[in-house]
Design a protein with these regions (language model features):
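Conserved AMP-binding/adenylate-forming core of the ANL superfamily
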Residues: 18-54, 67, 95, 147-148
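AMP-binding/adenylate-forming catalytic core of the ANL superfamily
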Residues: 342, 369-456, 495
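Conserved ATP/PPi-binding loop(s) of AMP-dependent carboxylate-activating enzymes
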Residues: 306, 314-315, 329-364, 378-379, ...
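A short N-terminal helical cap/helix-turn-helix that marks the beginning
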Residues: 1-21, 38-39, 123-128, 495
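Conserved AMP-binding/adenylate-forming
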Residues: 29, 46-90, 183-184
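Conserved AMP-binding A3 loop
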Residues: 32-33, 128-162
C-alpha cells in the first residue's frame, strides 16, 4: 500500500507556489516546498520528544485548532507512521476512543532547529487520513482515505479544472504570487483538506484564513491579493449582504468590498442560492459551484454562466452515475437519488478500529443521499433525503425550497428569516460558526410572540413553526418542526 510520503513528494517537489499561513497569534508566514518539509521534520522530532514514537498505522485523533498547526501536525504524525483522524475542536465524541492530541502542540516546537531532509525521505509514513461526516445518514460517522485515493482525486479534479474557465483565468496570471487562492475552510473538512492541494498542484499560492468568518475573509482577500477563493455558500451570501449594506449607493458594492483583483469564487458544501450566484457574476466575479461528499470527494463542477445558473454542473466524465427513483429503479435521467460509480475512488468507513468498504448498489454504485433532477447530463439539486419533510398528504418538502422563500430580519444582531411554504410558517436562523445559543433562539421566539400578540394561528397553517430540531442550532443553522395548537402561547408572524 502507498503511504502519505508520496503525497508529500508529489506536492512539494519542484513546485514554485507557496503555502501562506496565519498562526493562532495572527502572524503571517510564507513557506515554500523546502520550508514545509523542514517544518514537518522539526515538528515530528518535537513529537518524538513528547513520547510519540515511530508507529506503523496506529490511529491518532488530531484536534484541529487552526489550519497552520493542523497542517504541520498532520504531516508530522503521518511521517511517524501514524494514521490521522482530523477532528473539529468542538467535538468530544471520540476523545476516549483514540489517542488524542491538540494541534496546538505545534507551537511548542522550536522551528529554527537544525534539520536533515534526508531523514524525512527515509520514513515510512502512515497510510490513512480520516474525517467526520454526517454523510447520507444524518448521524456522524468516520470516513478514511488512503493516499492512492487522495492522489487520484487530486489528479481528476485538476484535469477537470484545466478544461474549465477557472484555468483560463489562472493562465492570465502567470506567477504563483499572482494566482493566490484563499482557503476559508478548516482542514478537518474534506473541502478544506483537498482543495488547497488541488490548487497548489496548479502552481497557485495557497493562503489559509486564520478566522473563518466573513470579516476575516474580506480582510484576507484584500490584504493578500487574492485571485480566487472557495468556501461554503452561506459565507458568500453573508458577504453579499454586508457589501450591499456597507455600500448602499455603489453601482457595484461587492467590488467595493472585495477589490478589483478577485476573479474566482468557488462555492461548495451545500446548495448556493441562485440570487447569490447572479449577484457575484453581475459584479464581474466568476462564480463556480461544485458538488461532492466526504465519502467520495468531488463529483461535479459548474460553469460561471447566467444561462446555467441553477445547475451544479456536470458529473466528471470519468465517473458513471444513475438516478435511483422511488421504486428502486436505476435510470439515466429524471428525478431521484443520485448514485455514483467513481470506479474505486471511495473513502472507507472507519468502524470498529478498521477501514471497511462502503455499501454499494450492485457492488459499484454509491448512494449519495441527495435528490437531484438529472437532465442533459447536468445536476439540479432538490434536497437531501435526511432533510426531507413529509407533509400530511405525503408530499416531500425540501428544506432548501423553504429557505429560498424566506425574508431576512434581525433581532439583537442575530439574522433570522420568517416566511411561508405551502401553508407552513417557517423560522430559519443563520448560525454560521455556532455562535448562537439556545437562549438566543428562545429570545427570538419571545420577540416574535411579543410583536404578534394579536395574531391567531390560522387553521390552514397546520399549527407548525419550523425552527431547529430540539431547539439546538447546528453550526450552519437549520430547520425543524415544532407543533403548536390553537391554545399555544406562541403566536406566529403574519406571512405573505
Amino acid at each position: 500500500m502507498k503511504r502519505f510520503g508520496e503525497l508529500l513528494n508529489y506536492l512539494y517537489t519542484n513546485r514554485e507556489g507557496k503555502f501562506i499561513f496565519y498562526d493562532r497569534d495572527n502572524n503571517r508566514f510564507e513557506y515554500d516546498s523546502v520550508d514545509i518539509k523542514k517544518h514537518i521534520l522539526i515538528v515530528s522530532d518535537h513529537l518524538k520528544s513528547k513520547g510519540f514514537e515511530l508507529k506503523k498505522d496506529q490511529w491518532i485523533r488530531l484536534i484541529s485548532k487552526d489550519n497552520c498547526s493542523s497542517f504541520f501536525m498532520m504531516f508530522a504524525l503521518l511521517s511517524l507512521g501514524y494514521n490521522v483522524l482530523l477532528a473539529n475542536p468542538n467535538d468530544d465524541s471520540d476523545r476516549d476512543s483514540f489517542r488524542t492530541v491538540d494541534s496546538d502542540v505545534y507551537y511548542e516546537a522550536s522551528l529554527d532547529k537544525e534539520y536533515d531532509l534526508g531523514d524525512l525521505e527515509k520514513r515510512e509514513f502512515g497510510s490513512w487520513v480520516g474525517f467526520y461526516s454526517s454523510g447520507t445518514t444524518g448521524y456522524q460517522k468516520k470516513f478514511v482515505y488512503n493516499v492512492e485515493t487522495v492522489l487520484r482525486l487530486i489528479s481528476n479534479v485538476r484535469s477537470i479544472i484545466m478544461d474549465n474557465n477557472i484555468y483560463g483565468i489562472l493562465e492570465e496570471n502567470k506567477m504563483p504570487s499572482d494566482r493566490r487562492i484563499l482557503s476559508t475552510l478548516p482542514m478537518y473538512h474534506i473541502l478544506g483538506f483537498l482543495v488547497p492541494f488541488i490548487m497548489y498542484s496548479l502552481e497557485c499560492d495557497i493562503v489559509f484564513c486564520k478566522y473563518l468568518y466573513p470579516n476575516s475573509i474580506i480582510d484576507s482577500i484584500n490584504k493578500d491579493n487574492i485571485l480566487g477563493v472557495f468556501g461554503v455558500p452561506l459565507v458568500w451570501e453573508l458577504i453579499m449582504n454586508m457589501a450591499q449594506k456597507r455600500f448602499p449607493d455603489s453601482a457595484n458594492p461587492i467590488r467595493e468590498m472585495l477589490g478589483d483583483k478577485i476573479q474566482i469564487v468557488l462555492g461548495g458544501g451545500s446548495k448556493t442560492n441562485r440570487r447569490v450566484r447572479e449577484t457575484y457574476i453581475d459584479s464581474g466575479i466568476d462564480f463556480f459551484v461544485g458538488y461532492g461528499m466526504t465519502e467520495i470527494g468531488f463529483l461535479s463542477l459548474s460553469s460561471s454562466d447566467l444561462e446555467d445558473i441553477d445547475s451544479e454542473g456536470s458529473i466528471y466524465p470519468m465517473y458513471d452515475y444513475k438516478i435511483l427513483n422511488e421504486q428502486g429503479k436505476l435510470m439515466d435521467c429524471g428525478e431521484g437519488e443520485l448514485v455514483v460509480n467513481t470506479r474505486g475512488i471511495y473513502s472507507y468507513i472507519f468502524d470498529g478500529g478498521e477501514p471497511k468498504s462502503l455499501d454499494l448498489i450492485e457492488g459499484k454504485y454509491f448512494e449519495t443521499g441527495d435528490i437531484f433532477i438529472l437532465e442533459d447530463g447536468k445536476l439540479y439539486f432538490k434536497g437531501r433525503k435526511k432533510n426531507i419533510i413529509v407533509s400530511s398528504n405525503g408530499e416531500n418538502i425540501f428544506a432548501y425550497e423553504i429557505e429560498a422563500r424566506l425574508d431576512r430580519s434581525y433581532f439583537n444582531n442575530i439574522p433570522f428569516c420568517i416566511g411561508d411554504y405551502q401553508g407552513l410558517v417557517a423560522l430559519y436562523l443563520y448560525n454560521y460558526g455556532g455562535l448562537f445559543s439556545e437562549a438566543s433562539v428562545e429570545a427570538i421566539i419571545r420577540h416574535l410572540v411579543d410583536v404578534n400578540k394579536g395574531l391567531h394561528i390560522n387553521s390552514k397553517i397546520k399549527k407548525s413553526i419550523l425552527i431547529n430540531e430540539k431547539g439546538v442550532l447546528t453550526s450552519k443553522g437549520g430547520l425543524a418542526i415544532y407543533k403548536l395548537n390553537e391554545n399555544s402561547d406562541i403566536r406566529v408572524v403574519n406571512v405573505k
